[in-house]
């Protein structure tokens, strides 16, 4: 097992609703360790705190109680070491595909001499022929692929994926799953993904963390002992699916 990269210690998060004079307890006393090279899938019903955990790790919000650390350094805000891909692609509409991908390198004055890295990312997602197009000319799936590699180009040690395939059709989702896995397996950084799709969680994850609500907490932490690429129809895959669906009270698939 690789060294611990990310640690959550006694993390709770509450949100105040001033207009209703009430407090929502989104997370309660979360303890969790994640290692370099892991692909963590967070699953659970709506309101169980999956996305709250991701936003805490990204540094977009702070815990009410507890602490989060990366390599023993406390998270106090956003950091390029933690790249995030949102559910809907956030691209600059006035920049071409090529310039969107290279934007962060340009901001760091690292673009010169790294043009080959941008070209490699374009090849990775199969959009070499669309590099001069603008986001408004792309399909939803193409735009999401651009958003993905824009986060990958800096090779962040931690990659955060907030249902980055949620708005895509089923066929495009499966292609995106394979593209994300290909990029992750090439770099073997820590990847953490929020999803409502149990099959997706098993197909991609080295661990599946099952959460429950009121307040959000970890119900189970399940290592997935399947080689890549994975077969959704295999007996072991179906066994994992039934186990997790049972924990989520959806019942096992027949």
What residue ranges belong to the model's regions?
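Conserved ABC transporter NBD signature motif
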Residues: 66-78
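Short helical segment in ABC ATPase nucleotide-binding domains corresponding to the A-loop/adjacent helical element
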Residues: 98-107, 115, 119, 223
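Hydrophobic anchor residue at the start of the ABC signature
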Residues: 148
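Conserved signature/switch motifs of ABC ATPase nucleotide-binding domains
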Residues: 133-136, 154
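The feature captures the beta-strand-to-loop junction immediately N-terminal to the Walker
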Residues: 43-45
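Conserved ABC ATPase "signature" region
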Residues: 112-130, 182
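Helix-to-loop junction immediately C-terminal to a conserved catalytic motif
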Residues: 58
């Amino acid at each position: 097992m690789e060294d611990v990269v990310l640690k959550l210690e006694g993390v709770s998060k509450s949100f105040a609703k001033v207009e209703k004079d009430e407090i929502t307890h989104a997370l309660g006393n979360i303890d969790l360790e994640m290692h370099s090279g892991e692909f963590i899938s967070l699953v659970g019903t709506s309101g169980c705190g999956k996305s709250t955990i991701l936003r805490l790790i990204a540094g977009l919000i702070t815990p009410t109680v507890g602490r989060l650390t990366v390599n023993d350094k406390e998270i106090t805000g956003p950091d390029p070491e933690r790249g995030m891909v949102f559910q809907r692609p956030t691209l600059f509409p006035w920049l071409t595909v090529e310039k969107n991908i290279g934007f962060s390198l340009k901001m760091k004055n690292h673009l010169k001499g790294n043009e080959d890295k941008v070209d490699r990312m374009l090849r990775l997602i199969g959009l070499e022929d669309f590099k001069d197009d603008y986001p408004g000319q792309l399909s939803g799936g193409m735009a999401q692929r651009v958003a993905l590699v824009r986060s990958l180009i800096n090779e962040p040690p931690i990659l955060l994926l907030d249902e980055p395939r949620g708005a895509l059709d089923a066929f495009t989702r499966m292609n995106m799953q394979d593209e994300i896995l290909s990029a992750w397996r090439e770099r073997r950084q820590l990847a953490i993904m929020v999803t409502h799709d149990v099959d997706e969680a098993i197909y991609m994850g080295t661990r599946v963390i099952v959460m429950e609500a009121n307040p959000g907490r970890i119900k189970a932490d399940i290592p997935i002992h399947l080689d890549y690429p994975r077969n959704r129809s295999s007996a072991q895959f179906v066994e994992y699916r039934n186990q997790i669906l049972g924990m989520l009270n959806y019942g096992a698939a027949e």
